[in-house]
Amino acid sequence: VYKRQVLHRGDVVVLDMEAGLEHMGRGTTEGMDQFIVVIEPGSRSVQTYKNVKRLAKDLGVKQVHVVANKIRDEKDEEFVKTHIPAEDLLGFIHYNTEIMDADRQGCSPYDYSKSAVDEIRKIKTTIDKIDDCDK
């Protein structure tokens, strides 16, 4: 459906795709110039990022960035920093019970967790800086 929409230069479309690589072979990546891969602090998740990055390059996607999710402590942050190149890492979203509470109540985390909103704003600022450099 999104391919049929008229987009203008500078427009942004965000697609939340299923975990894994299967969707990449279905033409869903056509016309995309960057991916944001959400990982968790674990070896399988890091390997998925590496596979996505390799396939993205083959498909002509120039940039693959990472948001690390469900970070519990400094060990998790250090694990991610050790395995993800600094230029690809957009930031961290820490494990947060308020997010789970919001989901159970059918509420947006944006309305429920100031700390999550602050972390997401930091990530958005990083994305904006990258976009400014690309212009």
In which residue ranges do the predicted regions lie?
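Exposed alpha-helical structural elements
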Residues: 79, 88, 115, 119-122
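C-terminal boundary of histidine-terminating zinc-finger modules
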Residues: 105-114
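Conserved catalytic-core segment of NTP-binding enzymes
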Residues: 4-92, 97, 101
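Active-site loops and adjacent core secondary-structure elements that bind or stabilize anionic groups
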Residues: 1
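C-terminal alpha-helix
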Residues: 119-134
